[in-house]
Amino acid sequence: VTDAMRATYAPTGVEFAITNSGGLRADLTCPTTDNPSDFCPAYTPPPYPITRGQVLTVLPFGNIVTTVTISGAELKTMLENGVSRMPAVDGRFPQVSGLCFTYDIALLAGSRVLSAFETDSTGNCTATPVDLTATSSYKIAENDFMTGGGDGYPVFSSRATTQDIMDQVTADYITANSPISPFVKAFPDGRINCADSNGAAAPNCPALTASP
């Protein structure tokens, strides 16, 4: 979803995309056993068709993409908010595109983000750092729920630009880029990496598996 947001608005200068996990209500993979109550087509081995109904199951709220230019410090505030409730399961946890970052789950909420780096065209982390200070600025895409302060994210309503409905943005991206992979890489090459400075004494990082 965030890849779709970033790619769609990259021509307008968008560098990163962030959405809250609570807005993603399903995934785009289908079970091997057919279920007439879901939106999956009859099962075939991957790559398999993705239906409009599946996209709407993932994004059922009708959220709209917004774009806004923020400072690096504001971006850090967003990332800090996103991991502030970890290891608890919380809808504010961010899904990102265009950047990868590392946070220390043992540190106090608000001071957990250690570093962030840009990703390349394939989604791999690069050595190019993201400047998380007030002296830098980045244009991002997010959803209108977050823009209005939902899930504790900073309020950017007064300076954000309203774009298109997220489900349509995602559907158009899938159509243009199929076949697509349903997974992103896990630690240590993933977009969001958890460190635990308490080590074995407090193994609170999530399981190191790939995510949809």
Give the positions of each predicted feature.
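Catalytic centers of hydrolytic enzymes
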Residues: 1-212
